[in-house]
């Protein structure tokens, strides 16, 4: 019993971690286009860019200081409470941004967005039932405005000092490690600090003055390489190019060019934030680069800014080009290997679970994950299952939060397409973690199949799991995510597939839709 209890507890923790990662992805992924646009502007038009332009370079600062944090805050608030949550979240985040204008408040936005969205949701739940008829617009607007007013001041007066304190602690910690000659360990603080946009505070507040003093005495300083090495970032992005999926994979190529050649390291930060375990990759990559340069006694005479391979090549002391390249390549290699393992690690256990579940189902006489049609036993039960579908789904929805993954999948017959009644289905939703990559491709593919089958009256869309509407009719998810989709939309029909782009269940679904809607 203890073993089973521990196993269920571990699975529960795993699902919570997965849900948290999904929430981070849903905040960051929709805004990657803004990151890339800003990255191009910064890489091309700044003083050390490819084509310096003083006028256009003025766009870079406001975009990273205001636009991107506000977009992230809006996304976080909207995930919790739709447009009202997003709008007030973005409004309140201005308090943190204005209080600390020299530091891009990405982390502050990721805190304020969901927090204010949740508060807006709770405010509406309290106010709306108590609103007199005819005063709905007045109460809605003023409740949102008052909450935005309060939380903006909260961000300015409370959260901003906390963020400033965190910055100070990181800076002091890095400086102490530098003075203690534990340079590779500096990466333990530097790399995570970079990801939350504290890189300028550490680089220019600590490394530049210390490096200038060191270079004045020794002719060069390794401190100029600690934060600016492009190796750890490009290692993560190459891992996404090879092992990533959907939008993350598609955008990693452009991000890699911007990061490695343009020196705009911030472009890879969202990719790490989407998978927090990748902090380990950039830390180990950074440590490798610092250790390599320490062994080779390599350093720059002046700061390497931006941290581009081009700037590194130009700044490398005469005769030490290979030393410079070695530090970058080894840092990138270690970061890539660890990132690849992490990306695969988050996938392999799920694959193993799916295979084990399929084997278990085959042993029990039920349909396996790769079967193209039902067994005779399942066929005999199909009619009875259809009749009992509504009762089963209702009973399961009432207890969805209390059941583990396997129980939910069994209760909802997620792998038995014939077990459901599709009379009233006119909308199919594909759902994945971020609601952009794999689900979008799956929806497009099924839309074409419906068109060829004469089912053009049925709408097919895609969304993130945590944005599934409560009144969803039919939801298609990958098997490892179906339990979360059920809890989000407990009254819907749920179908599990192993692969959005290649599943025999689509043909079964089309046949059932035609039969039930004739």
Curated annotation (Swiss-Prot):
It comes from Staphylococcus carnosus. This is PTS system mannitol-specific EIICB component. One of its GO terms (cellular component) is plasma membrane. Residues 375-387 have a biased composition (Basic and acidic residues). The phosphoenolpyruvate-dependent sugar phosphotransferase system (sugar PTS), a major carbohydrate active transport system, catalyzes the phosphorylation of incoming sugar substrates concomitantly with their translocation across the cell membrane. The enzyme II CmtAB PTS system is involved in D-mannitol transport. Residues 20-352 form the PTS EIIC type-2 domain. One of its GO terms (biological process) is phosphoenolpyruvate-dependent sugar phosphotransferase system. It holds the Pfam family PTS_EIIC.
């Amino acid at each position: 019993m203890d073993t089973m209890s521990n196993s269920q507890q571990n699975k529960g923790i795993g699902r919570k971690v997965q849900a948290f990662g999904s929430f981070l992805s849903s905040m960051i992924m929709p805004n990657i286009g803004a990151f890339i646009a800003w990255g191009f502007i910064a890489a091309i038009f700044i003083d050390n860019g490819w084509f310096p332009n003083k006028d256009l370079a003025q766009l870079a600062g406001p975009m990273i200081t205001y636009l991107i944090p506000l977009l992230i805050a809006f996304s976080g608030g909207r995930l919790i409470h739709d447009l009202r949550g997003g709008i007030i979240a973005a409004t309140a985040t201005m308090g943190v941004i204005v209080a600390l204008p020299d530091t891009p408040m990405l982390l502050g936005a990721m805190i304020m967005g969901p927090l204010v969205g949740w508060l807006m949701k709770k405010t509406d739940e309290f106010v709306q039932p108590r609103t007199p008829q005819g005063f709905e617009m007045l109460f809605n607007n003023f409740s949102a405005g008052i909450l935005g007013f309060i939380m903006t001041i909260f961000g300015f007066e409370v959260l901003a000092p906390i963020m400033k304190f965190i910055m100070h602690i990181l800076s002091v910690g890095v400086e102490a490690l530098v003075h203690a000659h534990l340079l590779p360990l500096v990466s333990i603080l530097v790399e995570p600090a970079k990801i939350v946009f504290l890189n300028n505070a550490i680089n220019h507040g600590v490394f530049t003055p210390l490096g200038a003093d060191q270079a004045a005495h020794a002719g060069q300083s390794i401190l100029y390489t600690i934060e600016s090495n492009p190796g750890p970032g490009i290692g993560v992005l190459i891992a996404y190019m090879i092992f990533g999926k959907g939008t993350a994979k598609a955008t990693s190529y452009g991000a890699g060019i911007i990061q490695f050649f343009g020196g705009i390291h911030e472009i890879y930060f969202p990719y790490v934030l989407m998978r927090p375990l990748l902090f380990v990759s950039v830390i180990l990559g950074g440590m490798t680069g610092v250790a390599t340069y320490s062994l080779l006694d390599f350093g720059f005479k002046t700061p390497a800014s931006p941290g581009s391979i081009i700037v590194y090549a130009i700044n490398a002391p005469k005769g030490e080009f290979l030393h410079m390249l070695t530090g970058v390549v080894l840092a990138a290699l270690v970061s890539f290997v660890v990132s690849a393992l992490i990306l695969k690690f988050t996938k392999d256990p799920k694959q193993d679970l799916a295979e084990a579940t399929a084997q278990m189902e085959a042993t029990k006489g039920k349909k396996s994950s790769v079967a193209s049609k039902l067994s005779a036993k399942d066929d005999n039960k199909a009619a009875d299952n259809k009749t009992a579908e509504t009762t089963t789904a209702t009973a399961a929805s009432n207890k969805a939060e209390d059941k583990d993954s396997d129980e939910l999948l069994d209760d909802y017959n997620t792998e038995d397409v014939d077990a459901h009644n599709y009379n009233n289905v006119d909308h199919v939703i594909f759902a994945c973690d971020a609601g952009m990559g794999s689900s979008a491709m799956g929806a497009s593919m099924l839309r074409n199949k419906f068109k060829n089958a004469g089912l053009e009256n049925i709408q097919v869309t895609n969304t993130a799991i945590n944005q599934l509407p409560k009144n969803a009719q039919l939801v298609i998810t990958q098997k490892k995510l179906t339990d979360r989709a059920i809890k989000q939309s407990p009254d819907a029909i749920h179908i599990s597939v192993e692969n959005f782009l290649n599943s025999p269940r689509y043909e079964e679904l089309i046949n059932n839709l035609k039969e039930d809607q004739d």
